[in-house]
Design a protein with these regions (language model features):
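Glycine- and small/polar-enriched repetitive beta-structure motifs of secreted/surface proteins
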Residues: 1-245, 252, 269-273, 325-333, ...
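Transmembrane beta-strand segments that form the barrel wall of outer-membrane beta-barrel proteins
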Residues: 159, 172, 312-321, 339-349
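Extended alpha-helical stalk/coiled-coil segments
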Residues: 266-294, 379, 383-393
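Outer-membrane beta-barrel transmembrane domain signature
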Residues: 291, 298-303, 321-323
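Outer-envelope beta-barrel architecture signal
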Residues: 309-315, 326-328, 338-340, 353-355
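Residues on the lipid-exposed face of transmembrane beta-strands in outer-membrane beta-barrel proteins
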Residues: 317-319, 330-334, 344-346, 357-361
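Structural signature of outer-membrane beta-barrel domains
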Residues: 322, 349-351, 362-364
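Repeated loop/turn-to-beta-strand initiation elements of outer-membrane beta-barrel proteins
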Residues: 338-344, 364-370
C-alpha cells in the first residue's frame, strides 16, 4: 500500500511507496520513499529521495540525500553533495558539491566471496566515469576508466587507473599506476611518474610514489528510517598514505615515425643511420689522412742530384708509406745558374694529386772551395804519381 504523509505530497501508481516530504512526489515503482522537501522519485525499487529537491529516476536502492542531487538508474548509488549526480553503476557516492559519477563501481564475485567496488567523488565538481575503486578528492578533478584511480590535485586527471598528488594541479596520469606528484606533470604509460613540474614521464625511479591509499574515518548517524548506521565521515579530510616503488622502471616508446623537424623525437633507426654515416665519414677521413701523410712523405723524398756548381735540369722520384697507404711523387729541379734553383714536385695516382714548388737563390759571397776532389780526380792524381814513381825507378 502507498502512504501519503507529507503535506501536498503525491503518489501516482506503484506499490508500497511512501511520500514523507512536503510537496514530494512518487511516480510508479515499488518501496520508494521521498523524505526531502520537493523531492521526487520516478519508478525503480527501494529508492530514497532524502535531500531537498532531490530526485531519483529508476534503478534500485539509490539515495538522493543531497540538496538538488539526482540519481538515474543503477544500484545502491548515493548523491550526498548538493547538486551532485550519479547515473548508472553500483555502490557509487557523489559527495562533493556538483560532483558526478557515470557508471562504474559494482559488486564482484571472486570465487570465494563478493567484493564491492565503490567510487567516491568527494571533490567539488569532481567527475568519475566508468571505473571502480576510484577516489576523486581534488576539486574539479576527473577519473576516467581503469581501477583504483586517485586524484588529489585540483583539476587533475587520471585515465586508466592513474593517480595525482595533492600538489599535482592541472596534471595528467595516463595508464595503470601512472601518476604525477607535481604541477603540470604528465605521466604516460604503466607505472610512469612525473616528479618535475611541467615534464612528461615515461617511467619511474626507485623511491618514486607508486600510488595513494585513501581512507575516510567512520561516524555514526541516524538515517531517514530512524536507524543508526556507520558511514564514512566526508566532512573530515581523509587519511592519505603514499606507497613507493622499490626499483626503477623505464618504458619504451614504440612504433614511432621518424622525426622531421628540429624538435621532433629521433628513432633508434635514425640514430643507427646517423651513426653509420658518421662511421663512414670517419673511415673516409682516416683514408684521406693516410693518403695525405703518405703523399707528404713522398714529396719529402724528392731531392736534386746536382754536384757543386752544376747547372741544368734534373728529375727525381720519391716514395711514401703510411698506415697501409703508399704514394709516389715525381719532382723536377732546374738550375739555370750556380746560384738559382727552381723545383716542382707532384704526387701521382689514387686521385690525391698533391704538389709543391719552390725557388731558392744563393746570396752573399761564395765560401772558399775546400779541397775535396771528385773520385775521378783522385784516381788521375794517383795514376800520375804511380807513373812518376816508375820513371824514377828505371
Amino acid at each position: 500500500r502507498d502512504r501519503l504523509i507529507g503535506n501536498y505530497a503525491t503518489i501516482s501508481g506503484g506499490e508500497d511507496n511512501i511520500a514523507y516530504g512536503e510537496s514530494s512526489s512518487i511516480s510508479g515503482g515499488n518501496a520508494n520513499g521521498t523524505y526531502g522537501l520537493h523531492s521526487s522519485i520516478s519508478g525503480g525499487r527501494g529508492n530514497n529521495a532524502g535531500g531537498e529537491i532531490g530526485s531519483v529516476m529508476g534503478g534500485s536502492q539509490n539515495n538522493a540525500d543531497g540538496k538538488g542531487s539526482t540519481l538515474g538508474g543503477g544500484l545502491g548509488n548515493t548523491g550526498k553533495g548538493e547538486w551532485s549526480s550519479v547515473f548508472g553503476g553500483s555502490k557509487n557516492e557523489a559527495v562533493g558539491t556538483g560532483a558526478t559519477i557515470l557508471g562504474g563501481g559494482g559488486r564482484e564475485f571472486t570465487g570465494t566471496k563478493f567484493v564491492t567496488h565503490k567510487n567516491i567523488a568527494n571533490g567539488e565538481y569532481a567527475t568519475i566515469v566508468g571505473t571502480r575503486d576510484a577516489n576523486s578528492v581534488g576539486n574539479g578533478s576527473t577519473i576516467l576508466g581503469g581501477a583504483g584511480g586517485v586524484t588529489l590535485g585540483k583539476v587533475s586527471t587520471s585515465v586508466g587507473g592513474g593517480f595525482t598528488g595533492s600538489k599535482a594541479e592541472n596534471s595528467v596520469a595516463l595508464g595503470y599506476k601512472s601518476g604525477s606528484v607535481v604541477k603540470y606533470g604528465t605521466a604516460l604509460g604503466h607505472e610512469s611518474v612525473a616528479t618535475e613540474e611541467g615534464t612528461i614521464a615515461f617511467g619511474h625511479d626507485a623511491g618514486d610514489v607508486s600510488g595513494y591509499k585513501v581512507v575516510y574515518q567512520k561516524k555514526e548517524i541516524t538515517n531517514h528510517l530512524g536507524n543508526k548506521v556507520w558511514v564514512p565521515d566526508y566532512d573530515k579530510d581523509p587519511t592519505v598514505t603514499p606507497t613507493t616503488f622499490d626499483k626503477a622502471k623505464y618504458n619504451r616508446l614504440v612504433k614511432l615515425a621518424d622525426g622531421i623537424d628540429a624538435h621532433d623525437a629521433v628513432t633508434v633507426g635514425q640514430l643507427e643511420s646517423a651513426i653509420g654515416e658518421l662511421q663512414s665519414a670517419g673511415t673516409k677521413l682516416q683514408t684521406t689522412v693516410n693518403q695525405a701523410t703518405a703523399s707528404s712523405y713522398a714529396l719529402a723524398g724528392l731531392h736534386p742530384n746536382f754536384s757543386e756548381g752544376e747547372t741544368g735540369l734534373g728529375l727525381s722520384v720519391g716514395f711514401g708509406h703510411y698506415h697501409g697507404t703508399t704514394a709516389i711523387a715525381l719532382g723536377a729541379f732546374y738550375r739555370p745558374t750556380r746560384n738559382i734553383q727552381w723545383n716542382l714536385g707532384t704526387v701521382i695516382g689514387k686521385g690525391n694529386q698533391g704538389f709543391n714548388g719552390g725557388f731558392s737563390i744563393k746570396v752573399g759571397p761564395e765560401s772558399k772551395k775546400v779541397a775535396n776532389e771528385s773520385m775521378e780526380a783522385r784516381i788521375a792524381i794517383r795514376t800520375t804519381n804511380f807513373r812518376i814513381g816508375e820513371s824514377l825507378n828505371k
